[in-house]
Amino acid sequence: MQPIISFEQFTFQYGHAAQPTLSDITFHIYPGEKVLIAGRSGSGKSTLAHCINGLIPFSYEGNSTGNVLIAGKDPREGSIFEQSKQVGTILQDQDAQFIGLTVEEDVAFYLENECVKQDNMKKIVSDSLRKVKMHTFHKQSPHELSGGQKQTVSLAGLLTTNADILLFDEPLANLDPLSAIHTIELMKDIHEQYNKTIVIIEHRIEEIFKLDLDKVILIDEGKVIAMGTPKEILASNILPRIGLREPIYIEALKRLHFDSNNDVIYPMENLQKEKVSNVIKEWMEKQVILKRNAKNKELLKVENLSFSYPNKQKVLENVNLLIYEGEIVALLGHNGAGKSTLAHSLIGINKMKNGKIALKGEDISSWSIRKRGEIISYVMQNPNHMITQPTVFEEVSFTLTLHNFSKEEIKNKVEGILKICGLYPFRNWPIQALSYGQKKRLTIASVLTTNPKLIILDEPTAGQDYYHYKQFMSFIKNLAKKGISFVVITHDMNLALEYTDRAVVLHEGKIIADNTVFDVLGNQETLQRANLRESSLTKLIKFSGIACPEKFMELYLDSTRREEGA
């Protein structure tokens, strides 16, 4: 069988770059395979994806050597239009992919360009939407859909093209746990029904491995450094060395000194249950529970907060919440549960229907957005949506300039904040020269100028690889030690487990759980009601038959935090 994607000694260098982004790339993907291409940020995996779908060389210019064949043809000798018939791409940013005003218009876009007759077009669009179970949404605007639904509509559009290769660019990056599971199941269904070749660019290893991949290709510093089945990749212990995360239950087994020389540790069901149980019991007996510090002073108190949009049912109903100084709280729940609405109510964008918000006992419910914004800051998921100035120094000093601080005061304050955030060496850099992670820290630096007491972070680690994820969350932990409180809106259960002090779960506008993270995420009923994903760590404990999984999670998290100095 001939490969459908073939790279041999392929090197690519952007026109403006001093060094090649891809060097001596060689691999083959065969028809019908499901393949993951993974690597940390900046590894070259996105450039490789662009070489597959034709964006290189037709949208991004550069110089290449070596051989590349997609469906038997060299894409450099054709056109991006021809390439799009062979390779269908689903972008990480779904909104950037939509053309039509309604779902059916968007799915019909390719067919319209092919001048397909209208009657036939309607049938193809209807069939494509039925294949992905989105036919009842055909008249809706794409922008009214959830992240998972948008991705599904994009896939329906690709099915109209009959492309043999489906390329997914970080398909799980912006999805809640339920939508991520749905997306993976949808990929499986499409593969089983149509035998498409599926190529995925992703660094969320644990989730995407559920797709039953045929092959994993690891990229680092522009080179292929490993290739094999998921089992072979996990057995090699290479993932942590290149800044990617192993499944958290495998991390746990290694921390427990589980001897896996004669065991296959992936998937979990292959483990010897009795051996796992004994190792966990022995480890637990040696552990000492950390003495819990008394809670800090109360910072913010929310009482009976309700909110509804005009002519709609309540989005928040009788929400009661306490936040303490220096505390990191995870705000969890599926898309539409009310997390963003609650955040917008705290910062004053939403005018609450009833209820009260108090800061250290003072009622701030009637405060203006500007006044409230000086003590409660909101950091968006995408840093590019917040940054307005051309350089790092100008961005951080912007608010101080508006408040008429003197040049000397601005210089001293900004430089101090940049040092705290690890950005002082880059103070004169242009914004476009910063990495994504540096931009995330820059948005934090900008809000620190007002000395906020509480910072709300919306999906702070979305789109970041594990190395930058750990770096950013350690930075947040250090700020919390200085007394700043954080509310972290996240779909990442591992982040909640490892870095937050408490978890609050919203469901249909109501708080259904508010407790320590290991109590909340160890509660199966809460997870099911809120459509949250159970951590593989709790699955491991259930698999082992150990009683009191919450107890193990408490001991394990205490241990990891001691090791990391958190």
UniProtKB/Swiss-Prot annotation:
Annotated ATP 2 binding sites: G333, H334, N335, G336, A337, G338, K339, S340
Keyword Kinase: no
Keywords, sorted A to Z: ATP-binding, Cell membrane, Membrane, Nucleotide-binding, Repeat, Translocase, Transport
Gene Ontology CC: one annotated term: ATP-binding cassette (ABC) transporter complex
Membrane topology label: Peripheral membrane protein
Superkingdom as given in the UniProt entry: Bacteria
Major localization class: membrane
Record EC number: 7.-.-.-
Pfam families recorded: ABC_tran, DUF3744
PROSITE patterns cross-referenced by the UniProt entry: ABC_TRANSPORTER_1, ABC_TRANSPORTER_2
Database matches in SMART domains: AAA
UniProt subcellular location: Cell membrane
SUPFAM superfamilies referenced in this protein's UniProt entry, alphabetically: P-loop containing nucleoside triphosphate hydrolases (SSF52540)
Molecular function GO terms recorded: ATP binding; ATP hydrolysis activity; ATPase-coupled transmembrane transporter activity
InterPro entries referenced in this protein's UniProt entry, alphabetically: AAA+_ATPase, ABC_Co_transporter, ABC_transporter-like_ATP-bd, ABC_transporter-like_CS, ABC_transpr_CbiO/EcfA_su, ECF_ABC_transporter_ATP-bd, P-loop_NTPase
Domain ABC transporter, first and last residues per copy: 5-246, 300-533
PANTHER family reported in the protein's UniProt record: ABC TRANSPORTER ATP-BINDING PROTEIN BC_2655-RELATED, HEAVY METAL TRANSPORTER
Family: Belongs to the ABC transporter superfamily.
Purpose of the protein: Probably part of an ABC transporter complex. Responsible for energy coupling to the transport system.
Name of the protein described by the UniProt record: Putative ABC transporter ATP-binding protein BC_2655
Organism: Bacillus cereus (strain ATCC 14579 / DSM 31 / CCUG 7414 / JCM 2152 / NBRC 15305 / NCIMB 9373 / NCTC 2599 / NRRL B-3711)
